[in-house]
């Protein structure tokens, strides 16, 4: 039987230029580390993405959902937390929900990823939601996350990613 964790989409299987361009919209630089090298700023270790300052670190074996999750933390955190960022993104439970919601929206902007693939990968990795699945949560129970993203300027009134960082002026 195949291990579902081994089946998640990894960075080596997507257009990394498209990913870097997406991250640059938010002032975040994708920095690849060598295979088997410890990923700087990684909270969870192993192949999980890391944040340090305005850099998002990853290896080619890093899961795409991990990169998008950490990028979403960067977008959602306050300017003060962003300024001192090194490994621990912090934030409230509601902000964490907003991060999960945003990572799905960002996945839709990457040609080889998309919402459906991210739902499957988040479920396989063990993300846990009240509705039992990422899709169920996103479609039925994420009103608070959407509202948080709108209130902080990350989504516009139509629910589209604005390109702004939370707490950014203007």
Predicted ranges, named:
Residues 41, 75-105:
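Post-HEXXH active-site segment of zinc metalloproteases
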């Amino acid at each position: 039987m195949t291990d579902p964790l081994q089946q998640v989409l990894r960075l080596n299987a997507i257009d990394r230029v498209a990913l870097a361009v997406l991250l640059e919209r938010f002032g975040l630089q994708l920095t690849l580390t060598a295979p088997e090298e410890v990923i700087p700023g990684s909270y969870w270790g192993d192949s999980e993405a890391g944040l340090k300052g305005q850099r998002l670190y990853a290896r080619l074996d890093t899961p795409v959902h991990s990169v998008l999750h950490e990028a979403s933390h960067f977008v959602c955190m306050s300017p003060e937390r962003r300024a001192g960022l090194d490994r621990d993104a912090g934030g409230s439970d509601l902000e964490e929900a907003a991060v999960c919601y945003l990572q799905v929206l960002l996945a839709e902007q990457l040609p080889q990823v998309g919402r459906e693939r991210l739902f499957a990968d988040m479920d396989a990795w063990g993300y846990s939601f009240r509705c039992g699945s990422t899709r169920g949560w996103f479609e039925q129970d994420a009103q608070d996350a959407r509202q948080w993203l709108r209130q902080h300027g990350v989504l516009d009134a139509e629910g589209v990613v604005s390109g702004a960082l939370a707490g950014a002026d203007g």
